[in-house]
UniProtKB/Swiss-Prot annotation:
Residues annotated to bind Mg(2+): V4, Q6, C28
PTM text: Preferentially phosphorylated in cells arrested early in S phase. Phosphorylation in the C-terminus weakens the interaction with CDC45.
Species, as recorded: Bos taurus (Bovine)
EC number: 3.1.1.96
Composition bias, Basic and acidic residues: 159-170, 181-194
Protein name according to UniProt: D-aminoacyl-tRNA deacylase 1
One annotated Gene Ontology cellular component of this protein: nucleus
UniProt lineage: Eukaryota, Metazoa, Chordata, Craniata, Vertebrata
Keyword tRNA-binding: yes
Record-stated family: Belongs to the DTD family.
Compartment(s) where it occurs, according to its Swiss-Prot or TrEMBL record: Nucleus; Cytoplasm
Length: 209
């Protein structure tokens, strides 16, 4: 799941020439749902969006307050194009969840968002419709979120088990001591003075005209 979060002074959605949704100060969230998204990703994204600190505090300190802290509004718009991959110059959307399934998932996302915050402060567009989204970005401030976050696979129990096994193999290799070839490399070599002097003679002869 991907989200583009923009801090706004106002934002609205128009469908067929009619404004269907609007907010004042707050955040506008463009949400892209992928084929692999589950309830776990949904809940993670809701927490991230609501707790993202993109606002100032009372003293003017930046990046101190979230939309919940400030009791500002949230406008959500479903945006499957965030799951785009390029084939040459042509966008391909095979990673996006199919519309029928995604609509139900998106409604669940909105429900969770409203439950975690204040229902009257969470607005949305119209799923599947051709929309004009008017965003007055404040700053501008635009943050990209992803669930799971890049690199989060390392916290997966299966992945951790693999890493532990790799570490154990390394430790066993160290415990065996140096291999024969490394012993040979580390063994002191006797100096061959004749070879050394011969090599020096070759070099000096190349330098002389």
């Amino acid at each position: 799941m991907k989200a583009v979060v923009q801090r706004v002074t106002r934002a609205s959605v128009t469908v067929g020439g009619e404004q269907i949704s609007a907010i004042g100060r707050g955040i506008c969230v463009l949400l892209g749902i992928s084929l692999e998204d589950t309830q776990k990703e949904l809940e993670h994204m809701v927490r991230k969006i609501l707790n993202l600190r993109v606002f100032e505090d009372e003293s003017g300190k930046h990046w101190s307050k979230s939309v919940m802290d400030k009791q500002y509004e949230v406008l959500c718009v479903s945006q499957f194009t965030l799951q785009c991959v390029l084939k040459g110059n042509k966008p391909d959307f095979h990673l996006a969840m199919p519309a029928e399934q995604a609509e139900s998932f998106y409604k669940g996302f909105l429900e969770q968002l409203r439950k975690a915050y204040r229902p009257e402060l969470v607005k949305d567009g119209k799923f599947g419709a051709y929309m004009q989204v008017h965003i007055q970005n404040d700053g501008p401030v635009t943050i990209e979120l992803e669930s799971p976050a890049p690199g989060a696979a390392a916290s997966d129990p299966k992945q951790l088990s693999k890493l532990e096994k790799q570490q154990q193999r390394k430790e066993k290799t160290r415990a065996k001591g140096p291999s024969e070839s490394s012993k040979e490399r580390s063994a002191p070599r006797k100096e061959d003075r004749s070879a050394s002097s011969g090599a020096e003679g070759d070099v000096s002869s190349e330098r002389e005209p």
